[in-house]
Amino acid sequence: MLRNGFIIQSQESIYKMIYVLEDDNSIREFVVYTLCHMDLEAKGFERPSEFWAGMEETLPSLILLDIMLPEEDGLSVLKKLREHADTKEVPVIMLTAKDSEYDK
């Protein structure tokens, strides 16, 4: 069922889908590989535009979201997710490779 530009699916059909939005290829591939070897479905996206296109196809049960991204940062992606009725309840885990005191 299509509602507000997003496909709505039963809870059973999205139970294991995890989206990974990470622009660093090696990190994205590692995370997706690890999740898949845990018998979970995972799909990686390099850019927010690809991620939004994926969201129109399938709503995931979890999103792993990088903070620093091309096109728009992860915090603005999170804000958009929380503003939309169909995605505001999707759990999001923020990822970052930043480790300096300034970044904390």
Question: Over which residues does each language-model region extend?
Answer:
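Conserved Asp/Asn-Gly motif in the active-site loop of CheY-like receiver
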Residues: 24, 45-49, 104
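Short, conserved "switch-loop" micro-motifs in signal-transduction and mechanochemical regulators
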Residues: 84, 98-99
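Active-site residues of response regulator receiver
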Residues: 66, 96
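His-Asp phosphorelay/catalytic-motif detector in bacterial-type signaling
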Residues: 59-61, 86-91
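The feature encodes the CheY-like receiver
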Residues: 70, 100
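Two-component/phosphorelay signaling modules centered on CheY-like receiver
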Residues: 24-43
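Acidic, metal-coordinating helix/loop segments flanking the phosphotransfer/catalytic sites
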Residues: 44-62
